[in-house]
From Swiss-Prot:
<dbReference type="GO" id="GO:0009116">
    <property type="term" value="P:nucleoside metabolic process"/>
</dbReference>
<dbReference type="InterPro" id="IPR015422">
    <property type="entry name" value="PyrdxlP-dep_Trfase_small"/>
</dbReference>
<dbReference type="InterPro" id="IPR020581">
    <property type="entry name" value="GDC_P"/>
</dbReference>
<dbReference type="InterPro" id="IPR015421">
    <property type="entry name" value="PyrdxlP-dep_Trfase_major"/>
</dbReference>
<dbReference type="InterPro" id="IPR049315">
    <property type="entry name" value="GDC-P_N"/>
</dbReference>
<dbReference type="GO" id="GO:0019464">
    <property type="term" value="P:glycine decarboxylation via glycine cleavage system"/>
</dbReference>
<protein>
    <recommendedName>
        <fullName>Probable glycine dehydrogenase (decarboxylating) subunit 1</fullName>
        <ecNumber>1.4.4.2</ecNumber>
    </recommendedName>
</protein>
<keyword id="KW-0560">Oxidoreductase</keyword>
<dbReference type="Pfam" id="PF02347">
    <property type="entry name" value="GDC-P"/>
</dbReference>
<dbReference type="GO" id="GO:0004375">
    <property type="term" value="F:glycine dehydrogenase (decarboxylating) activity"/>
</dbReference>
<comment type="function">
    <text>The glycine cleavage system catalyzes the degradation of glycine. The P protein binds the alpha-amino group of glycine through its pyridoxal phosphate cofactor; CO(2) is released and the remaining methylamine moiety is then transferred to the lipoamide cofactor of the H protein.</text>
</comment>
<dbReference type="InterPro" id="IPR023010">
    <property type="entry name" value="GcvPA"/>
</dbReference>
<comment type="similarity">
    <text>Belongs to the GcvP family. N-terminal subunit subfamily.</text>
</comment>
<dbReference type="InterPro" id="IPR015424">
    <property type="entry name" value="PyrdxlP-dep_Trfase"/>
</dbReference>
<comment type="subunit">
    <text>The glycine cleavage system is composed of four proteins: P, T, L and H. In this organism, the P 'protein' is a heterodimer of two subunits.</text>
</comment>
Length: 456
């Protein structure tokens, strides 16, 4: 039904009908101390022209800085064609394509997306997306627990180098499902998971192992050894990966002796703008043998009664709209529009283009680290190789440095000390393909000035 606001006369008549003098009388039972004072100063309504002027005034307060922040959300170049196509009326819809005969275009695009994700991850089947990277990993953990019929403990090992927000999301979702989450410590010299701590669980009943590649610090984990450990210990292995890195690094399906069991991650780098944190989408892929425990939509290819190729939702008996409480997941939709953009993005770039993006990210970050570590009081925090972000250690308070950089128009990075107290005064920095040599030089010059002034 349309939204029709009440007229002043409507409001007056309704208040008279219930014996109230004004709107505030409706809230008298709520103590004043619990009422939000800000609602008392809401300005009167304005017309469209005044609203546009106010929006322009507010927009002028924004500052367009040079961004060197990564930590799970990355600034990549998005070809103009991506959202020009994704915004077409044929794609720009919230409709879930249950009616296959009327949705062949959308279904084929989702099918192509699944194929691309499988090619990137080295797996056999993908779903049509999850809400974001964090919930995709949480769903992957739940899926791993369902898959491991031999385990009686529901104990899940998660590398401490997995994104802290992802680990918090997992804790939130599994805490009431009789699943014990154990965080593995990391080597504070290398910046990767301490394999000695992992080996302590050899022979024990461990349900699943979660590995990040690259990890939160940007470092490259010893994924072959960790995956092989999981296989020999009859533990389901879960890989949480950055899709951009897969254009250069070994796909999770080839890790160790047999590859991982489940792959998931954040799809934002594939054509979605940073957009203040969302919306994004998560991806999840696995082995065909595990498909019936996979959450979310799956699109399949089939033939119609005339023998023509067609596409439809398949294996729907796993899902909430059919199985209700017995479904593999409470997720009953997908991030279709973001997946549409990701499919167009990957199609436009192709394998060679994705490889060029990943290579440029890798080179830019190494050039950035080389420039920054030449400054007195700045050093690389970890020894392990890194992909397109890295942690630097400062001899000055990190919040002071970040504020000074911000004043100079530079978003200088992410301070992880709130999650890792042992990493005080460190800064996680990232340089994707959009950062130029001039951007890197400006960052280095500005940081050098800040460090020298504070030191003096």
């Amino acid at each position: 039904m349309p939204y029709i606001p009440h007229t002043p006369n409507d409001t007056k008549e309704m208040l008279e009908a219930i014996g109230a003098q004004d709107i505030q009388d409706l809230f008298d039972e709520i103590p004043a101390s619990l009422q939000y004072a800000g609602f008392q100063n809401i300005p009167a309504g304005i017309n469209e022209m005044e609203m546009l002027k106010e929006a322009q005034n507010q927009a002028q307060k924004n500052r367009n800085g040079i961004c060197f922040i990564g930590a799970g959300c990355y600034e990549h170049h998005i070809p103009a064609a991506v959202w020009d196509i994704a915004s077409r009326g044929e794609f720009l819809t919230a409709y879930t394509p249950y009616q296959a005969e009327a949705s062949q275009g959308t279904l084929q695009l989702l099918y192509e997306y699944q194929t691309m994700i499988c090619e990137l991850t080295g797996m056999e089947v993908s779903n049509a997306s999850m809400y974001d990277g964090a919930t995709a990993l949480a769903e992957a953990v739940l899926m791993a627990v369902r898959l491991n019929k031999h385990s009686k403990t529901n104990r899940v090992l998660i590398a401490g180098t997995v994104h802290p927000f992802y680990r918090e999301t997992i804790e939130t979702i599994v805490r009431n499902q009789h699943i014990e989450v154990i965080t593995l410590p990391f080597d504070e010299q290398q910046g990767i998971t301490d394999l000695g701590s992992l080996n302590q669980y050899t022979g024990e009943d461990i349900t699943a192992l979660v590995i990040a590649q690259p990890n939160f610090f940007g470092c490259l984990e010893q994924v072959d050894k960790m995956t092989s450990w999981a296989h020999h210990n009859k533990t389901i292995s879960v890989a949480c990966v950055n899709p951009t890195s897969l254009a250069l690094l070994k796909p999770p399906g080839s890790w160790g002796e047999h590859g991982v069991d489940i792959v998931c991650g954040e799809g934002q780098p594939l054509g979605s703008p940073m957009a203040s944190g969302g919306p994004y989408f998560g991806f999840l892929s696995t082995r065909m043998a595990h498909v019936r425990q996979m959450p979310g939509r799956i699109i399949g290819r089939t033939v119609d009664k005339d023998g023509k190729t067609g596409f439809s939702l398949t294996l729907q008996a796993r899902e909430q709209h059919i199985r209700r409480a017995k479904a593999t997941s409470n997720i009953c939709t997908n991030q279709g529009l973001l997946v549409t953009a990701a499919t167009i993005y990957m199609s436009l770039l192709g394998p060679e283009g994705l490889s060029q993006v990943a290579t440029q990210c890798h080179q830019n970050t190494h050039e950035l680290i080389t420039a920054l570590t030449q400054i007195e009081g700045v050093e690389l925090a970890f020894k392990a190789p890194f992909f397109h972000e890295a942690l630097i250690k400062l001899n000055q308070p990190v919040q002071y440095v970040l504020q000074q950089l911000a004043d100079a128009g530079i978003a200088g990075g992410y301070a992880p000390e709130q999650h890792y107290p042992q990493l005080a005064n460190t800064l996680l920095v990232c340089a994707t393909e959009v950062r130029t040599a001039e951007d890197i030089a400006k960052y280095a010059k500005t940081l050098k000035t800040i460090m020298s002034k504070r030191g003096a």
